């Protein structure tokens, strides 16, 4: 028995089995020296030894977001209503749910030309990321500041940033849904496939290192992968490819169509319970714009026509109070009439100038507030054009010179004082050297009248006397 199987003093001998016994050259000293010099041991069987846990790698020098990006596919920039825009996360207190979306764009070579890829937007909590030193609301063309209701922008959390060597990106989920013209990268990405291929010992080691290194992190939301926006985007792409192969057009969402019954039902609602949209505009539901106490003074011509379907409405709605604020912030008074009780309200809304949407609000107010004063005056409906006071009558008489019947077209002509400018100019008496120089309208008129004699009768009632 070789000496390597003897137990050392105070140390129990490990039970190790080998498929093949090494030859005489494979001595303990050579194996020890070879391992010290970094050489690979000759015995390749390592099943008996426990694998060493992998040490977590240090964070990279750049700042990496906890969340996967939103990819912009449309022309509209990223915008969120007030109180929305922070990704849904676990382990983050609502006080710290505020941050910014950073716009990035890469380029690549295609056909010898530089092509820009779709812009990508990454979310960072306030105080983290590339612009971690900026105060909330600081203006930057590549940044959109967002914050949830109840968040305190003056308090910063300890979420930090992500180490991509230890953690995969979290797919973005928004309470209000992904904005139109964007899709969220997420499930089925490199991070998940990599983590599923790791063995249990490495996963447990990495999990322990996460808990000790990152502290309070957003965590992974427990959601069904089939409900992710990324899967919905893939389904949409597959449907589009299928339609291209079959030659059929993909089914598109029909615009909202309001039937007469729906419009009538909307009209039966109380005015403050109606909703104006493209099929039922502002004027139909709330009346004309004007200076009266019961007349609205907000909305330009486009906003009045489209109502809530106007692309600016979402930003304008951020200025409007919710139900609770309306009831408890307004100064209310009543006025009793025979058929109804009128509830009057008066109040004010504060729009902070340091809000990132302040400039957009002021622009919307400038375009829509009292815009009715610049509306063109309404033109009265025009009556149908009166028929021209001309009449034609065709008679047959015998031409004395030829002895044959000749068609005569009698044209009743207006008096010169009653003729319009166009009618007066139409009677051009200019003598042209060449007939082709005459205007085409007159040449066509002459051609039509070439088969009949033209007789002008001043008094239609005395046609017989004038012809004789």
Swiss-Prot record:
Residues 62-186 form the CoV N NTD domain. Residues 259-376 form the CoV N CTD domain. Residues 1-64, 181-228, 373-399, 419-468 are annotated as: Disordered. GO terms for molecular function: RNA binding. Residues 190-223 have a biased composition (Low complexity). The keyword Phosphoprotein applies. RNA binds at residues 106, 120, 162. Residues 48-193 are annotated as: RNA-binding. InterPro entries: N_prot_C_CoV, N_prot_N_CoV, NCAP_bCoV, Nucleocap_CoV, Nucleocapsid_C, Nucleocapsid_N. Residues 18-33, 379-390 have a biased composition (Basic and acidic residues). GO terms for cellular component: host cell endoplasmic reticulum-Golgi intermediate compartment; host cell Golgi apparatus; ribonucleoprotein complex; viral nucleocapsid. Residues 270-373 are annotated as: Dimerization. The modification Phosphothreonine is found at residue 451. Residues 419-436 have a biased composition (Acidic residues). The modification Phosphoserine is found at residue 165. Homooligomer. Both monomeric and oligomeric forms interact with RNA. Interacts with protein M. Interacts with NSP3; this interaction serves to tether the genome to the newly translated replicase-transcriptase complex at a very early stage of infection. Belongs to the betacoronavirus nucleocapsid protein family. This is Nucleoprotein.
């Amino acid at each position: 028995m070789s000496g390597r199987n003897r137990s050392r003093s105070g140390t129990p001998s490990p039970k190790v089995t080998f498929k093949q016994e090494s030859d005489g050259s494979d001595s303990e000293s050579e194996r020890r020296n070879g391992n010290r010099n970094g050489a690979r041991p000759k015995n390749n069987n390592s099943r008996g030894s426990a694998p060493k846990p992998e040490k977590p790698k240090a964070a990279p020098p750049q700042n990496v977001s906890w969340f996967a990006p939103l990819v912009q596919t449309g022309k509209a920039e990223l915008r969120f209503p007030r109180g929305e825009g922070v990704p849904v996360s676990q382990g983050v207190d609502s006080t710290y749910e505020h941050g910014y979306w950073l716009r990035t764009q890469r380029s690549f070579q295609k056909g010898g030309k530089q092509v820009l890829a779709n812009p990508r937007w990454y979310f960072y909590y306030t105080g983290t990321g590339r612009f971690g030193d900026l105060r909330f609301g600081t203006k930057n063309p590549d940044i959109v500041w967002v914050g949830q209701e109840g968040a305190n922008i003056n308090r910063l959390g300890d979420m930090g940033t992500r180490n991509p060597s230890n953690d995969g990106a979290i797919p973005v989920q928004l309470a209000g849904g992904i904005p139109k013209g964007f899709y969220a990268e997420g499930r089925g990405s490199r991070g998940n496939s990599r983590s599923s291929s790791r063995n249990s010992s490495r996963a447990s080691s990495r999990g322990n290192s996460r808990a000790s290194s990152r502290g309070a992190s957003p965590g992974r939301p427990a959601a069904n992968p089939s409900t992710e926006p990324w899967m919905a985007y893939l389904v949409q792409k597959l449907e589009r490819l299928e339609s291209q192969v079959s030659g059929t057009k993909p089914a598109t969402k029909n615009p909202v169509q309001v039937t007469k019954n729906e419009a009538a039902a909307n009209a039966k609602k109380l005015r403050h319970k109606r909703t104006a949209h493209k099929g039922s505009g502002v004027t139909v539901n709330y009346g004309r714009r004007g200076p009266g106490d019961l007349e609205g003074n907000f909305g330009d011509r486009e906003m009045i026509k489209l109502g809530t379907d106007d692309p600016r409405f979402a930003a304008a709605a951020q200025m409007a109070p919710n139900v609770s604020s309306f009831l408890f912030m307004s100064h209310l008074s009543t006025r009793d009439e025979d058929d109804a009780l009128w509830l009057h309200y008066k109040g004010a809304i504060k729009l902070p100038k340091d809000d990132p949407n302040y400039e957009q609000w002021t622009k919307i107010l400038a375009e829509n507030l009292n815009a009715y004063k610049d509306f063109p005056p309404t033109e009265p409906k025009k009556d149908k054009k009166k028929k021209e006071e001309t009449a034609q009558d065709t008679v047959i008489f015998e031409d004395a010179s030829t002895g044959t019947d000749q068609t005569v077209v009698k044209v009743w002509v207006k008096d010169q004082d009653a003729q319009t400018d166009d009618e007066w100019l139409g009677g051009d008496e200019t003598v042209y050297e060449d007939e082709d120089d005459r205007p085409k309208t007159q040449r066509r008129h002459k051609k039509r009248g070439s088969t009949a004699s033209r007789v002008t009768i001043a008094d239609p009632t005395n046609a017989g006397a004038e012809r004789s």
